Amino acid sequence: MKSYPIILIVLIIFFGLSSCISIKKYNEQRTTCISPDQMKEDVDFSYSKLKEMHPQLYWYISKEELDFKFDSLKRTIKEPLTPIQFYFKLQPVITSIREGHLALRIPRKKFTKKEIKALEHKKGIFSRFEYYIKDDHLYIIKNNDSIENIKPGTEILSINDIPVSEYIKKYKKLINSDGLNTTFQPYFLKDVFFNFYTAEYGVNEKATIKTLYDHEKKIYTLKREAKSEEDLKKDKAQEKRTAERKINDYVPLSDSYNRSFKFLDSDKTIAYIKVKSFSQDYSSTFYKETFSKIKTANSSYLIIDIRNNYGGSLYEINNLYSYLTSEPFSLIKPSQVTSISTPLKTNYFRKSNPFQYIFKSLLYPTYFFAQSFSTYKKDGSVYYKMRADKPTKPNKDAFQGKIFVLINGGSFSASSIITAKLKHDKRVVLIGEETGGANDGTVAGFYSYQKLPHSKINLPIGLLLVKPNIQFSNTKRGVIPDIAITESMQDIIENKDPQLDWVINEIEGEKKAKQFPPTSKDL
C-alpha cells in the first residue's frame, strides 16, 4: 500500500517530462519550413474534410468558386514556408466560405508550466488597454492603469515601426461573420487583434508604439511590468467562486460577470438583464431567480442586452426563451448533419492527459452507444436529436409585458438564433445594429478537430446545421433591428449609451401616455 504514492510521484514526473518534450517538439515544428508539396497536401486534406463533414459548405459560396479558390491557392505555393506563414495563406480561403465559426487555429507558441507561471506574475503589454476599430484604424478607448497617461481616443499608428493599417488589412482576411453582413468584423477583430499579433511576433517584453491624439504624435515604449504583491493578492481573490459569482458567471480575467440583472427605476417597472455570453454555467438558477423577482415586482417592461455576446449554449437560450413567451414553442428546426456517423467524429479523447484517457476509455462504450443512436433519417437527410428542437412549455414565471432587446454586430451565433426567433414571433422590439450572426442559422453545435498532416494546424469543423424555427429571410444577412441606432467611439469613451437611452425614452413616453391619455378635446 505504501508503494502507491511513490508510483504516483514517478508517473507525475514522467508525464511532466513528456509534456515538456512534447511542447519543445511542437515549438520546433512550428518554426520549421514545410515543402510546397506537403502544403498542397494539407490544402487538399482541408478541403476534403470540409466536404465530408460540413453540412452546408456552399451556403454563401458556390462549389465552383470555392474549387477555384483552393486550386488558385495551390498554384501560389512555390517555396517552403513555416506553419504560421502557411496559415496566413490558407485561412483567407477558409474565410471566403463566410461561416463565422469556421476557422483554422493559428499555430501559437506553446509554453511550459514554468513559463506560464512566470507570465502570470507579469502584466501584459497590450491586454491592459481596451480597443476600438474603425476601417483601418485602431484606437485605445480605455486605459485602466493610466499607462504613460495615454488618453482614451488615442489612435495607435504603428507597432514596432509597422503601420497598424497593414496589420488590420492582413488580419481582416482571417475572420468573417456568417453570410454577407459586415457588422461582426470590427467587434471581433478588436478582441483578437493582439492574439494574431503575438502568434506572429511572439510574447515579447516590450513594444514601441507611435500614437496620435488631438493632432499630436507621440512615441511610447510599453513594457511587461512585474505584478505587485497587491496585484497578485487581487488575482488570487478573483479566483474564489462564491455563490453570487457562480450564478452570475464571474470572469476573473475581466473582473466582470457574464450575467447581471437590475431594475432601472425606483418603482421597478423596468427590468434589465445583460448577458455577455450564453455559457450555461448556473444559468438556470440565474433566470429562475431573476424572473421570479420581475414577477414579484410586477414589472411592465423588460430590456435584454445581448450586445457583444458571441453566443454559447443552445440549452441556455432555449431556457431563456421559455421566460419570454406565453405559448409552447420549438426554438430551432431539426439540426442536420452529413451522415449517421458524424457524431462519432468529435475527437472524444481530445486534450486528454494520460489519467483522463484511461477514465474516458472506460466510458467510451457508453459514449459510442449514445452517439450511435443520436441521429435519424427523414426525407433523405440525416438529423441529430436535440432538446432545443422539441416543443417546450412556457415557464410559469414567463414575462408578460413589453420586451426590448439590444443587439449589435457583436451579437453572434446563439445570440442571433434567439434574436431571430423573437423577431419572427413578434415578441420584442429590436434596437441597435444588424447582428454579426446570420438570421437564418449557422453551422456549429459540436466540432470535429482535424489536424493538417504536415503543418499540424488544427481545423475545427462545425458538424451541426442549426436553424431557428422561423420563416427564413434568405437574405444571407444578420438579424435586422426594428430601430437602427449605432454607437460611436466617443459614446463609449464618455460612457453614453444611445441604444439604451432610446429604449428608456420610449418607455417614459409610453408611461406618460398611459398616465395622461389624450382627451376628446386633444383629438
List the model feature ranges, each with a label:
Residues 12-15, 106, 426, 504:
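Generic low-complexity, intrinsically disordered sequence content enriched
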Residues 1-27:
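Bacterial Sec-dependent N-terminal signal peptides
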Residues 6, 392, 518-519:
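Generic low-complexity segments that are intrinsically disordered, proline-rich and/or Lys/Arg-biased
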Residues 19-302, 306-337, 348-349, 439-451, ...:
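Flexible, low-complexity junctional segments that flank or bridge functional domains
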Residues 154, 296, 314-492, 506:
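Conserved acidic, small-residue-rich alpha-beta core segments centered on
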